[in-house]
Amino acid sequence: MIDLHTHTNGSDGEKTPEELIDLAISKKITALAITDHDTVDSIEKAVKYAKSKDILLIPGIEVEAQIKKGQMHILGLFVDYKNKELRKKLKYIKKARDSRNLKFIEEFNKLGFNITLDELKEVSEGKIIGKPHFAKIFLRKKYIKEKDEIFQNYFEKTPFKEIPKTIYGPEEVIKTLKEANAIVILAHPQSLKLENEELKEKIKELKKYGLDGLECYHSKQTKKQMEDFKNIAQEYGLIITKGSDYHGPNTKPGIELGTGKKNNIVLEESEEKDMVNKLLEISKNRYV
């Protein structure tokens, strides 16, 4: 079994890199990509820890690209996490994210809540602050009963949804990841909120920038979406990947490492091996 889209507490996941790797091994996962949001700070620790383990650890990252409709997240697999230009861009993204978080705090406090930056830093343990950290505070203060309430009632509505986090468009994100030798994958394509024909046009555009693949198996996809995305990937000569988008049982309840939601991303062993072999072949050629 494999999982090519996961998060640690380096961003908004719950487990340390070591804990995530141990969990993967306990589930007989043979290839694991760590793809934290907008940061590669956990990768070095993960790579060192995995060296003595029976698992292929794939250095990765997930970066959001600025678009007008929906959300576009782009994965970089086998990324050179020491690349100077990548790290420079990630610093700019962190500043934009910090600015967004301050605006979130301001808007929440206007509504009568009491949220501080110090609280966010505490629950994030000094790592990248994301929306799940706001949810933790809201749960702690009993402003909400379930984590999803903060997304449904606030983050997905005005003015919160209009507050931008990212500063780079798809072309710049893909270019930066390619320069860091990453294999570039469009994560959970359903987040773009496009019909199949519109999605095809968008993929044609992204392919011109250097897109390598499509995440065709994701925990939040229906069977039909998986089939549609797989067909689109094959039509445009893109590699196919699978990822649970695992964060942990409290952050994303019901999503399991390697198997997704109710085993919805469990595939034949041969198909998963083929995915990894293709990634290894591309990665080998890029680093030669």
Label every PLM stretch briefly:
Residues 1-70, 154-157, 168, 172-251:
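An N-terminally biased module of ancient metal coordination in phosphate/nucleic-acid-related enzymes
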Residues 51-204, 263-288:
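Extended substrate/RNA-proximal surfaces in nucleic-acid metabolism proteins
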Residues 253-267:
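Conserved, well-ordered active-site substructure
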